[in-house]
């Protein structure tokens, strides 16, 4: 599948047991997450979208996907392990996403693993642990631009462990 210029999320699976999401490309998604479209989000927070992610899934597996240029919004990252149990992202690629590579979203997202992925020049902060209890990062390669924090500002309240990740600075 190839998703380009979606107004919000690119690909989202919901309430699924062991979904497999592979060989997809999301390009320039979340292009309508802005004040012109969401002029009064109120208490709903409204302007949130990520490229490829699960919602309330058990043992979701995401592999061989590519995400580029997810637009800046309150989420805005390539991948988001959100409110599920056992999500695994492996062998994926991300580049130049407005708010980073991956978010582990809040307390309900448990037992999630991000491994063997490549992130190149994702912006705003490469990872967002966002109050997550136990995210795992394993054997990833992160190319991080000078001045971009590895952990996204104001999304750093969670716990994560890293094992054999490579963080390589790039100059722009």
Task: Walk through the language-model features, giving the residues of each.
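Aromatic/acidic polysaccharide-binding cleft in carbohydrate-active enzymes
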Residues: 149
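Active-site rim elements
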Residues: 125, 152
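Extracellular glycoside hydrolase catalytic/binding regions
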Residues: 102-105
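Right-handed parallel beta-helix
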Residues: 1-9, 17-42, 48-71, 78, ...
């Amino acid at each position: 599948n190839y998703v380009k210029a979606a107004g919000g999320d690119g690909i989202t699976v919901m309430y699924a047991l062991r979904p497999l999401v592979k060989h997809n490309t999301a390009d320039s998604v979340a292009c309508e997450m802005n004040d012109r479209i969401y002029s009064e989000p109120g208490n709903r927070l409204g302007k949130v979208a990520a490229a490829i992610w699960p919602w309330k899934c058990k043992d979701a597996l995401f592999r061989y996907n590519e995400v580029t240029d997810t637009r800046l919004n309150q989420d805005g990252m390539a991948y988001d392990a959100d409110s599920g149990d056992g999500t695994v992202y492996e062998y994926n690629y991300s580049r130049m996403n407005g708010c980073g590579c991956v978010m582990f979203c809040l307390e309900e997202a448990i037992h999630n693993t991000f491994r063997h992925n490549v992130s190149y020049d994702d912006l705003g902060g490469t990872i967002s642990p966002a109050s997550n209890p136990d995210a795992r990062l394993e054997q990833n390669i992160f190319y991080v631009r000078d001045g971009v924090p590895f952990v996204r500002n104001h999304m750093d309240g969670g716990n994560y462990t890293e094992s054999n990740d490579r963080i390589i600075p790039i100059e722009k």
